[in-house]
Amino acid sequence: MSERRALVTGASTGLGREMARQLAARGFRVAGTGRRERELAETARLVAAAGGECLTLEGSVCEPEVVARHAGAIRERWGGLDWLVLNAGIGDGVDARRFSAERYHRVFATNVGGAVNWLDAVLPWMIEAGHGTVAGISSLAAWRGLPGAGAYSASKIALATLLESTRVDLRGTGVRVVTVFPGFIRNRGVPTEADRGKPFLLDLEDGVRRILDGIESGRPVVHFPWPLSLPMRHVVRHLPPWAFDWLMARLAPRG
C-alpha cells in the first residue's frame, strides 16, 4: 500500500478532483470530500486509474459534525494523515451595490469555516504524530479587494491569515503549513465562456501540478504564475488607495 495519506476537501469536481488524481499518481492514498455522491464516484474512478486508493466522504465541510465523522473514518482506516489539503471553496460575484449578507455568509462558511472545521479535526493528530503538512488554497484575489469579488477576496485573505498564524504557532511541532496563491486555473478540462478574458489562464492539469510541486517544495508560501503573481504581490498589493482605485476603474469599469 502507498505510504503517504492525503485528504483533499472539495474533491468532487475541478481542482480538487485533479489534485486527488495527481496525488494518487505520486503514490498517495487519497481521501476526498464532496457534496455529490456521483461526482465523488468519478473522482474515485480516476484515482484508481492512476494507481491509487480513494476513500470518498460525502457531505459538507461547513458542518462540524460531518467533518468529525469523516475524520473518524480516515483515522479508523488509515490511522492518520500526512497531508491535509484545504481546497473546498466557492465564489460569488457579490457587487456591493447589491449587497447580500446571505451570500457573504455562504462563501465564508465554505472557504473559511470549512478549513476551520478540518483543522480542528486533524491538527491534534498531526501535532501528536510530530509531522504532517497542511496546505490551504487561497488566491491571488486575496491580495486586494477586487471589484465584484468582495466575499471571495475577503474569504481568501481570511484563509491566508488563518494559515499564516497557524504556521507560526506550529513552529517546532514538525507540522508544516503552506499557503498557495494560484492565479486563474481552468476548472474543467475544456475551455468555457467563464474563462474568457482571464489573464495567464492555466490548464487544469498544469495548474494542479504547480500546486502540488509547490506544496512538496517546502516553501511556506507558493504563488503562480509569476507574470501575474509577482506584479500582484509586489506592486498592486502595495498601491496606495487612490492608485488602486484608478487602476480598478480602468480594468473593471462600473456597468
Tell me the role of every PLM-derived stretch.
Residues 12-13:
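Conserved glycine-rich cofactor-binding loop
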Residues 26-42:
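Conserved glycine-rich Rossmann-like NAD(P)H-binding loop of the short-chain dehydrogenase/reductase
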Residues 87-92:
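Conserved NAD(P)H cofactor-binding loop of Rossmann-fold oxidoreductase domains
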Residues 95-108:
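Substrate-binding pocket helix/loop in short-chain dehydrogenase/reductase
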Residues 119, 155:
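Active-site helix of classical SDR
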Residues 139:
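Residue(s) in the substrate-gating loop at a strand-loop-helix junction
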